Amino acid sequence: CTGRLVTPSFGCGHHHIYSALARGMPPAPKAPANFLEVLEYVWWRMDKKLDHDMIEASALVTGLYCAKNGVTFVIDHHASPFHLDGSLETIAKALDRVGLGHLLCYEISCRDGEEIKEKGLDETDAFLSSGRKGHVGLHASFTVDDDLLGRAVDLARKHKTGVHIHVAEGIEDQEHCARTYGKSVVRRLSDAGVLDLPLSILGHCVHLDAEERDLIRTSPCWVVQNTESNLNNNVGLGRYNDFPRVMLGTDGMHSDMIRSAQSSYFIAGLAEGGMSPLAAYQRLRAVHAHIQGHNAPGGGANNLVILNYDSPTPLTQDNFPGHFCYAFDARNVESVISQGRLIVDHGRLAGMDEADILAYANEQARRLWALL
């Protein structure tokens, strides 16, 4: 490692592995006019077609890209309502093969009826009962009724974990909650006990009022920021600088946490009144504390990334965050160690054939696209 930088590897606080085969897929039958239509015409249309092989290919190719980007741990939020049974174990085994740590969940909701809702609860209980680590996943307040919300919190308590849910990503979530329950999204989640669980993850948190911010600020739960996805979906920019526990995620847009950290840094001037490079780097690193809270495999000190970075200016411990925010990218990732095992060696995945993974992903993408 002479002349190289060695740092802890990266973790993704919120991913959607199931979207990996969406790159370049056929357009929606109608151009979405708002966030709800993005869900209805794009993602909900796609996730209903996923089967075991598509899910496996999605996990393998996501694992490949994570590893090559220096990401050795993934917190994922999965959806495949008509191929639900065993889906979490399929993802777990694929990520294990690549060598990544993970905390998985299935995003249970009421959008596909009672039978699918019950299957989501059963899948979650079975996965967590098997000894795997993860969360109890929910889609969002506007697709989760009171029965499901209460049972999800009970299930999380049973397994000593948290609830992983999208929160006020679009303003529609708040409008539905006010109309249906007479309260804000975060107040509803707080009343149900979600915010009492230290391992709960609230994704996005874009449209919050002052009371909701106070509820989150005084709770032990986590918030995850997904800047690029929020920009892509035109839902707005969240403000996160007053929350004590904030992680960074990609929301399935990609698997590059260097890029996510830089995006959060560059957008902070608009959303948060500015942020220092050190603060952006610390936000990137916050995920490690969440992982350690689960005692999950892959959260230890034997997870490292070796960076090949030739700087034209002096590089010191003090100015490292500035170099990171302005100059680093995934091309600097040379080798990666995950749980003490070399999984990327000089830019190539170790122990698996990259070409085979990509060919499998292409095959499954064609199958998926033919169904859309």
Where are the model-predicted features located?
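Histidine-rich, glycine-flanked metal-binding segment
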Residues: C1-T7
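Metal-coordinating catalytic core of metallo-dependent amide/deamination hydrolases
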Residues: H83-V206
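Alpha-helical scaffold segments that flank or form the walls of functional sites
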Residues: V6, M25-H78, F82-L100, D122-S129, ...
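Histidine-centered catalytic micro-motifs
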Residues: P8-A20, G162-I171
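His/Asp/Glu-enriched, well-ordered alpha-helical/loop segment
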Residues: D191-L197, R239-Y309, A327-F328
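Active-site gating loops and adjacent loop-to-helix segments of metal-dependent hydrolytic enzymes
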Residues: L21-I55, G113, V167, I171-L197, ...
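A conserved active-site cap/scaffold subdomain adjacent to cofactor or substrate pockets
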Residues: G203, H207-P244, G249
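Active-site microenvironment of metallo-dependent hydrolases
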Residues: Y281-L372
